[in-house]
From Swiss-Prot:
Keywords: FAD, Flavoprotein, NADP, Oxidoreductase. InterPro entries: FAD/NAD-bd_sf, FAD/NAD-binding_dom, Fd--NADP_Rdtase_type_2, Ferredoxin-NADP_redctase_2. Binds 1 FAD per subunit. It catalyses: 2 reduced [2Fe-2S]-[ferredoxin] + NADP(+) + H(+) = 2 oxidized [2Fe-2S]-[ferredoxin] + NADPH. The keyword Aminoacyl-tRNA synthetase does not apply. FAD binds at residues 17, 36, 44, 49, 89, 124, 289, 330. This is Ferredoxin--NADP reductase. It comes from Bradyrhizobium sp. (strain BTAi1 / ATCC BAA-1182). PANTHER family: THIOREDOXIN REDUCTASE 1-RELATED-RELATED.
Amino acid sequence: MSEAIKTDVLIIGAGPCGLFAVFELGLLDIKAHLIDILDKVGGQCAELYPEKPIYDIPGVPMVTGQGLTDQLMEQIKPFSPTFHLGEMVEKVEKIGDPGFRVTTDAGKVFECKVVVIAAGGGSFQPKRPPVPGIEAYEGTSVFYAVRKMEQFRDKNVVIVGGGDSALDWTLNLHPLAKRITLVHRRDDFRAAPHSVEQMRALVASGKMDLRIGQVSALEGANGVLAAASIKGNDNSVETVACDMMLPFFGLTMKLGPVADWGIALENNLIPVETSAFETSVPGIFAIGDINTYPGKIKLILCGFHEGALMAQKAHRYVYPEKRLVFQYTTSSSSLQKKLGVN
């Protein structure tokens, strides 16, 4: 087991509610780490509708999903949160009163006094492409997110998909990889036009390959890939060298391992009390779309409210001997100093 990373609060989910929780906790001198299965912050806002306008954030007539994410990231800068992206929490164990040990699928271990679940509708799970035997290579040669770019250096990399993730990683890994082959079922891409133009320029100059079709088979042994077969739309089959494969077929929402953490559930949601949005396990809170209570409305602004009340209760666990004096950012010089505005 790796050495534990110690923090006051561990937030599971780096969407808007998780990000704003950092702000509310930071005002109370509570440090936070955040874990998200996605390879970027913003949750559904950034992943599913980055350009979609949002009209119901108080005081902001219109903001896009990505715009809101960017503003929240700017707002929490003074508190220097640490992000662990492309990781999924697998286990939450109680080790003290208060105290929890949290383990991710990347083998990281955290020890904290409070856990905040801000995971939206659950964890995003990558869609597995329908390639026979692909499971044998997952985690060794087939990856659904890029954690360390360096592992792709001098490798023959096959990237499958036609959206922003596929094109972004095609362009980002191209300078490192021995050869990039992008595979998409049609010669029409959903990615940003500029990214598509860059990719086509690389193909035209012979610096990477584009194949229209689908990966139909994999070759290798002991979890190590050697080649991939690509079936074209004309039913022709081509075999290309493949050391690593990155399929980007989109994401589905699943409750995931939350069901194994000993927390009471109700219709795949986490019931909470409404004074601080604490779950059935003291010290574990749930805010945002993943929780449920009488009168619950799934709005971002409601999640912000839940985060503010959660932070007040979390302070009792982190600083049990310290009396909390409520202050306003408009008038408190100490809070303004924390925010860097005084």
